[in-house]
Amino acid sequence: TSQDRVADIGAMVTEVLSAMKIVQGFNQEGREHGRFQEAVERTFSVARRRVMIRAAMTAVVILLVFGGITLLVWRGAQAVSEGTITGGTIAAFVLTAGLVAGAIGALTEVYGDLLRGAGAASRLSELLDEQPVITAPARPQELPVPPRGGLSFRNVTFRYPTRLEAPAITDFSLEVEPGETVAIVGPSGAGKSTIFQLAERFYDPQAGSIRLDGIPLTGADPAEVRRRIAYVPQEGVLFSANARDNLRYGNWGASEEDIWAAARAANASGFLQKLPQGLDTYLGESGTQLSGGQRQRIAIARALLRDAPILLLDEATSALDAESERLVQDALEHLMEDRTTLVIAHRLSTVRAADRIVVMEDGRIVEQGTHQQLSSNGGLYARLASLQFGLESA
């Protein structure tokens, strides 16, 4: 339908505009212009066909209506000449017929509106009919209070729904003690990010179990599980709102004092104070008015305000300069005291102080231990460390 084609154009425009620097950097403006033009032409063709059908229907209705009126006038004129009815009567009939004709003509407009509404309703009904895969059980198990922060993976095997032929992790077992800091390292595609998604129960594994403080995640309310976790992604995600709302997104009850304390700990207070309206400054769509490092620091402050017993850090300092990284790392180390922390590290220099380092490859744990132990084992970690530290020193 034309509604589908218009939706496709909207999605294409949003995608290209959000990646404009990539488009320009690879000199693909011409190609994207061509794609957009083709999409517009397809939409125009569908709309033109719809308009032509609608115009034909309108023409038929007008022909029938005015044909009927003409026949009525002709027969009325005959009746007037024969004296069976008066001229006033025929005039009243013609006026009434005109009103009826107008109403019938408007039906074509209503029919067109109904078709457009049916197209939109069809798309909405598909979304409304979708059932959530992850739901709370009828009688969820209560998580321990106060929370301890223990997290365990036992023989977990997981395949993404779109890639059932290739397991993301296989027979994965990991016991994380309360207050322990565990760094997860490995090459791209090893399954590191999958661990985080399973921990927050965005997916359920096909085999094995995941427990939070001894309670299986499948038996707990997903909302309660996520309240005990603070997550900092590799790239800071902000919303089209002011700085204050972005900071307290994970804790709407945070006071002004708490907000500024978290901002100072994340080394974000300096640039926040310089914003035109301070915390009330609108940050633009997805925080486009800030640099990547500034967005990341707001994301870290947001996690600090969450004050959850478990922290998931996906290389939380990767977007910061050297000085800011040191300050934020100090703040994170203070924050991680007495909290369970899982860190996905792409730079091995950020995980040397972890209590334990887990090395993953092809969805499995191949090594684990401290930095000193793994560096002397001559395994995958030692190879990654020698390569990375050698490049950094060079």
Question: For the regions a protein language model found, what residue spans apply to each?
Answer:
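ABC-type nucleotide-binding domain
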Residues: 144-394
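Conserved catalytic Walker-motif region of ABC-type ATPase nucleotide-binding domains
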Residues: 36, 124, 153-155
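Regular, well-ordered alpha-helical segments
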Residues: 11, 18, 22-25, 45, ...
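Short, solvent-exposed loop/turn elements at beta->coil junctions and helix N-caps
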Residues: 138-143
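The DHp (HisKA) dimerization/phosphotransfer helix of two-component histidine kinases
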Residues: 15, 22, 42, 73, ...
